[in-house]
Amino acid sequence: MKYVEGFVENIIFRNEDNGYTVFNIVYDDEEITCVGVLSYINTGEFITAQGEFVKHAVYYMQFKVTSYEFRAPDDAASVRRYLSSGAIKGIGEKMAERIVKTFGDDTFRIMEEEPERLAEIKGISMSKAMDIANQLIDKKDIRKAMMFLQRYGIQMNLANKIFKRYGNDIYNILEQNPYRLADDIEGVGFRTADEIASRAGIKIDSEFRIKSGIFYVLNQATMQGHTYLPYDKLVRQVNELLLIDVQDYDKYLMDLTMDKKIVVKVKDNIKCVYARMYYNMEANVAAMLNNLDVQIEEDQKFIDDRIARIEDKEGITLDDIQKEAVAKAVRNGLVIVTGGPGTGKTTTINTIIKYFELEGLEIRLAAPTGRAAKRMTEACGYEAQTIHRMLEISGGVPDGDRKSAAAGLSMFFERNEDNPLEADVIIVDEMSMVDISIMNSLLKAVSIGTKLILVGDVDQLPSVGPGNVLKDIIESGCFPVVKLERIFRQAAQSEIIINAHKINRGEEVVLNKYSKDFLFVHRNGADNIINAMKTLIKDKLPDYVGADVYDLQILTPSRKSNVGVERLNKIMQDFLNPADAIKQERQVGDVTFREGDKVMQIKNDYQLTWEKRSRYGIPTEQGTGAFNGDTGVIERISTFDENVTVKFEDGRFVTYEFSQLDELELAYAITVHKSQGSEYPAVIIPMSQGPRMLMNRNILYTAVTRARKCVCLVGEEEIFRLMAGNVSESKRYSSLADRIEEIRYIEDFGQ
């Protein structure tokens, strides 16, 4: 580490949101450009900064500050310089000269300790003297806080967030319960808070640490798709996290229950522990679904005649199950339509749309992702939106608490129970990937009396987010469900569809490289598999399916294996978008982002702003929100502005500060989970050994059904057979079905 010191000559740039500052300091006539998160420095101040010199591509050498200390002015010249800088509102150059002339080297002490004496100077009233004193106190408090936080090893960008949140309460919080940071501050998890607590001398068996650990494990479980954990599993994971043998868990669970942070329920003699937010979501969703489940009387002959009229006009023929789906949509407020590829879901939904159009009803279509919404629009000839956009997402976050935003709560949508959607019928496709938080937000915006039709393939992978919404709704047995199973003639010509159903039913699939749309390229060993994939994605498949290279997608079950996402992305980046002197880059950890890279948003960020642009680059539409699974291409990396601009597939341009790049990852290869709701002209799937829990039928089925024109499996046939035969799946702990059944029981028995 190196040190530089001097007077802050001028602030060149400051991002008021994150505190990133570019400034010059001067000492002994030498000027040094410094950069870092220093929200609270001002021109005229004398600082000692710690950091390293870095070479900027445009602006040559800069000093990257990691920590700093302020030195109070200690002579007349430095006081004059500080006061003349404008750091203290109400003091200009002339006033600064008068103050220093009166008090000399003792000026700064008098301003801090005897501020009333400033009123001795012409032009300064007693109230102005007190205002100057208060400004100095505020600045001193900030500097003291920054130094205090740095002693705990807290980096300046995080120190900035902590001080903004707590102000002068930071001393009590860090010395008594640093684990509050994990609850309140975005970017602080349990592990960061635990490290700070260790430096603060908090005991490893502190009740604050144990309760924070319990809550952390529950929240981590939601990242794995769970809405609760069984007691024994929770205890085991908390003990592993804390590295202590915690006694009397029931006491801590009771405390957390009293604090309204968790809920404990007993199911089949098993104690189930929920983060309260997710328990409430499941309970709310169950209640709202129940409210929508109303029956409407309608003459069967009238329904049959209208369906026949639509069939005749559209030149289609529905089978009996499809007609049943239409009739149930007419007669019920809530209907679920499920089925695999080629079973006529689109034809059924189109008929339902035509039916309600004849009724003159207002219809809204939605899907979880931009890709899925685009597909729905193309298939139905009726505009579909993402669920987020239909609900009119808002970038505002109550009280600046972005931690809550990550949960996807309905408070971040303009459409809610107080401002419901204006629609008579709402149809939502790709329901298998809708998690409990989005379902909660959606249902809040649906009025009683509005028909809700949920469509999806229950055999697909469940949502990335917590819950198992579609499966739980169906398994509750409480709502009308229609399962489409017949494969129609046109679909029966597609080996993708035929083989997908064979995989799902556990039937034998014939593999060869001569199929027109379901190819198997035999290769042994990860390197040989990857080389074959390179040839396919660049030289063979684009012309074969008539698509751009970036429209094709490599899907792989895992992240860490020899053919996992991380390794494949590095290899495919170098192959498809190699480094070039004219391409700007940005390194983030082990990943290099490069102009021209294919990237994916990997978390929901409700505050990111976006714009759409005309062909001339003029903004034509603006909004907020970028969502998990959105894919695009890096258009520009600016080392001067320290940001990256991505153009997403739907035409949105989003600019990320360098500090936000953890929200992106390369997307030449993505996990099968991340592909949910998407469809690609062709998919390439490596068949190589990976983690057994991911080598299952559900993953394979989901992967092959992502392809529209061609599936290309590359690797070892025995791996394909292993996956197709492995029906075990990772247990997902969710209880929406239980909550639905509870409500029905109460309705039926009044208890």
Give short role names for the model-derived ranges.
Residues R14-I25, F640-T645:
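Short aromatic-glycine-enriched beta-strand elements
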Residues V458-T624:
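Conserved helicase motor core of P-loop NTPases
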Residues R505, E621-G623, N628-Q751:
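C-terminal accessory regions
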